[in-house]
Amino acid sequence: MPPKTRGAVRKPRKKDKKNIALGQAHIKSTFNNTIVSITDPTGAVISWASSGEVGFKGSRKSTPFAAQMAAEAAAKRAQEHGMRKVDVFVKGPGSGRETAIRSLQAAGLEVGSIQDVTPAAHNGCRPPKRRRV
């Protein structure tokens, strides 16, 4: 029986530098995490970051500081692709909403407009029961 040969070794594909000046920043801020996705105008994701991805675990992911770090990381990666101006879409009730927007501006992205696109139920599913602490 001949010795097994390993398959072709795959080289990691280098991301091609897109040159997109205008885009959209989608901030999803839940009670447990904050996810920042920066897309081109068609909606194709250019860069993203979340509180968990930048190194926070557990209940620290839901803090405004974690949202700030995630937004900065996503903005830096987007600027490598030539992003300069974003329109911001915020979704969810979490604590990192405003902090994420501020840190996008601080990272050097110009914020054009801010829209709240939080989905509101028209009396759909029953919400979770009240917490008793």
Swiss-Prot record:
Gene that this sequence comes from: rpsK
UniProt keyword Ribonucleoprotein present: yes
Biased composition (Basic residues): 7-17
GO BP annotation list: translation
Family statement: Belongs to the universal ribosomal protein uS11 family.
Highest taxon above the source species: Bacteria
Name this polypeptide is given: Small ribosomal subunit protein uS11
Key words, A-Z: Ribonucleoprotein, Ribosomal protein, RNA-binding, rRNA-binding
InterPro entries, per the entry: Ribosomal_uS11 (IPR001971), Ribosomal_uS11_bac-type (IPR019981), Ribosomal_uS11_CS (IPR018102), Ribosomal_uS11_sf (IPR036967)
Record function comment: Located on the platform of the 30S subunit, it bridges several disparate RNA helices of the 16S rRNA. Forms part of the Shine-Dalgarno cleft in the 70S ribosome.
Region (Disordered): 1-23
Gene Ontology, cellular component aspect: ribonucleoprotein complex; ribosome
PROSITE patterns, A to Z: RIBOSOMAL_S11
GO molecular function annotations of the record: rRNA binding; structural constituent of ribosome
Record's subunit section: Part of the 30S ribosomal subunit. Interacts with proteins S7 and S18. Binds to IF-3.
Family annotation (Pfam families): Ribosomal_S11
